[in-house]
């Protein structure tokens, strides 16, 4: 059987690269959403936004679609930036600077990354899973790898930021990796049922 086309509902190059590495062993052809395709994220949770994106891209392309919505929630900031993580400021550098400035008055630096994944076919949701990673916000950026808030998110118990880790390590302990650990058996089952 030919590979199944799966459209990644994202224009984020860092995220697309991670998805490709995480799904490397699957009989799927990973495609990216149409250039310029914009989806308004109107959900109030990461999962609602992932669902909105997966359905919209699947309906637009006629293929299965995989969407994620993920972000950083900082305890002292009442969960901010949360679902607004990518819209917190206009660049990664500015987002990091803004978050560090807002955290200055607080001693509590606990944070968690969450990744909600959704696979849809047309308007039907086929799979939904969420993964998490607990950590702390550092006082300054550390490391050169990754993207987004990776340089200021130190994983609990490891003393390393995401940006200090190589891809393999981040894949095994990170929020997206944890979500994919839950997604993969369900995706295998889905692909198996499509072959019948």
From Swiss-Prot:
It comes from the Bacteria. Substrate binds at residues 10-15, 70, 147-150, 170, 175-176. The active site is at residue 69. GO terms for cellular component: cytosol. Mg(2+) binds at residues 40, 69. GO terms for molecular function: dITP diphosphatase activity; ITP diphosphatase activity; metal ion binding; nucleotide binding; ribonucleoside triphosphate phosphatase activity; XTP diphosphatase activity. GO terms for biological process: nucleotide metabolic process; purine nucleoside triphosphate catabolic process. Binds 1 Mg(2+) ion per subunit. Its EC number is 3.6.1.66. The keyword Metal-binding applies. Its cofactor is Mg(2+). Keywords: Hydrolase, Magnesium, Metal-binding, Nucleotide metabolism, Nucleotide-binding. InterPro entries: dITP/XTP_pyrophosphatase, ITPase-like_fam, RdgB/HAM1. It catalyses: XTP + H2O = XMP + diphosphate + H(+); dITP + H2O = dIMP + diphosphate + H(+); ITP + H2O = IMP + diphosphate + H(+). Belongs to the HAM1 NTPase family. PANTHER family: INOSINE TRIPHOSPHATE PYROPHOSPHATASE, INOSINE TRIPHOSPHATE PYROPHOSPHATASE/HAM1 PROTEIN. HAMAP family: Non_canon_purine_NTPase. Pyrophosphatase that catalyzes the hydrolysis of nucleoside triphosphates to their monophosphate derivatives, with a high preference for the non-canonical purine nucleotides XTP (xanthosine triphosphate), dITP (deoxyinosine triphosphate) and ITP. Seems to function as a house-cleaning enzyme that removes non-canonical purine nucleotides from the nucleotide pool, thus preventing their incorporation into DNA/RNA and avoiding chromosomal lesions. Homodimer. This is dITP/XTP pyrophosphatase. It comes from Prochlorococcus marinus (strain NATL2A). The lineage of its organism: Bacteria, Bacillati, Cyanobacteriota, Cyanophyceae, Synechococcales.
């Amino acid at each position: 059987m030919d590979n199944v086309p799966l459209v990644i509902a994202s224009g984020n190059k860092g995220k697309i690269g991670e998805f490709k590495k995480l799904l490397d062993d699957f009989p799927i052809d990973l495609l990216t959403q149409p250039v310029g395709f914009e989806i308004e994220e109107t959900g109030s949770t990461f999962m609602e936004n992932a669902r909105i994106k997966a359905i919209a891209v699947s309906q637009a392309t006629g293929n299965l679609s995989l969407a994620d919505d993920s972000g950083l929630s900082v305890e002292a900031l009442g969960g901010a930036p949360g679902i607004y993580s990518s819209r917190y400021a206009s660049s990664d550098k500015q987002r990091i600077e803004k978050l560090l400035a807002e955290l200055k008055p607080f001693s509590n630096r606990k944070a968690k990354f969450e990744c909600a994944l959704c696979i849809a076919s047309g308007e039907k949701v086929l799979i939904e899973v969420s993964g998490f990673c607990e950590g702390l916000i550092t006082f300054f950026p550390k490391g050169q790898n990754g993207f987004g808030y990776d340089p200021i998110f130190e994983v609990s118990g490891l003393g390393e930021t995401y940006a200090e880790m190589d891809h393999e390590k981040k894949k095994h302990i990170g929020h997206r990796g944890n979500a994919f650990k839950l997604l993969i058996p369900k995706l295998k089952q889905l692909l198996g049922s499509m072959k019948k």
